[in-house]
A protein has these predicted regions:
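C-terminal His-loop and adjacent cap/lid subdomain of alpha/beta-hydrolase
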Residues: 1-191
Length: 191
C-alpha cells in the first residue's frame, strides 16, 4: 500500500499536481451548475472496495446541509446494494439506467423517484447490456429486481407478491426516531 500511495501522490516537473488533487471533491458549492439548470445523479455501490460509499454519502449530506430541501431539485444519490466499484459483485443488482433517468430529468423535468435495478447475471434482464459481467448477481435468483431509492430512502417489501419483483417494493424514508436511521438502516436494509 505504501508504494501505491506514493505512486498516486507522485508529482514531477511535467505533472506538478498529483491525481489525488482531483479525487478529493469536497466543495459543495454547485451554484454555477444549478444556475444552468444542471442535474446530477450520484450512485455508489455499497460493496465498493475502492472508494467508501460513506464518503459519497458524506458529500451528499454536506450538499444537503448547504442547499437544504432544494438539493432534491438538482441532485439525487442512489446506493446500489451489493455492487462493487461501478459494477459487479456476486450479490449485485447492477443493471439499471441512470442515463435514461438523467435524460428524463433534464429534458422532461421528471426527477427520478426510483430506478429499477436487475440482476445482470441473467442476460435477458438487461437489453442494454447483453453481455453482462459474468459474476454480477451470480449469488442471486435469476431475474431479481428491486427499486433503487434516492438516499436516504430504502426499498421496503410491501408484503404481497413475489419478493423477487421490484413492483412489490416501495421506497420509504427512514423513521427519524429509529436509532438505526438513517445511514445504517438505509445502507444495510436487505429483504
Amino acid at each position: 500500500m505504501d508504494d501505491l500511495n506514493e505512486a498516486v501522490n507522485a508529482t514531477n516537473s511535467t505533472f506538478t499536481q498529483s491525481a489525488v488533487t482531483y479525487m478529493e471533491a469536497t466543495s459543495t458549492n454547485l451554484d454555477t451548475f444549478t444556475a444552468h439548470n444542471g442535474k446530477i445523479i450520484f450512485f455508489h455501490g455499497e460493496s465498493d472496495p475502492v472508494f467508501s460509499m460513506y464518503d459519497t454519502v458524506s458529500y451528499y449530506e454536506n450538499l444537503s446541509s448547504r442547499d437544504g430541501s432544494n438539493t432534491g431539485t438538482f441532485a439525487r444519490l442512489f446506493l446500489i446494494p451489493g455492487m462493487n466499484h461501478c459494477s459487479g459483485g456476486s450479490y449485485a443488482l447492477d443493471s439499471f439506467d441512470p442515463l435514461g433517468a438523467i435524460v428524463s430529468w433534464v429534458e422532461a423535468g421528471t426527477a427520478p423517484d426510483s430506478m429499477i435495478a436487475r440482476n445482470s447475471f441473467n442476460p435477458t434482464a438487461n437489453p442494454l447490456n447483453p453481455t453482462p459481467n459474468p459474476l454480477s448477481g451470480s449469488a442471486l435468483p435469476s431475474g431479481r429486481s428491486r427499486p433503487l431509492c434516492p438516499y436516504p430512502q430504502y426499498a421496503q417489501y410491501t408484503g404481497t407478491g413475489s419478493s423477487e419483483d421490484a413492483a412489490n417494493f416501495t421506497c420509504v424514508a427512514p423513521n427519524p426516531d429509529d436509532e438505526l436511521a438513517p445511514k445504517v438502516k438505509t445502507i444495510f436494509h436487505r429483504q
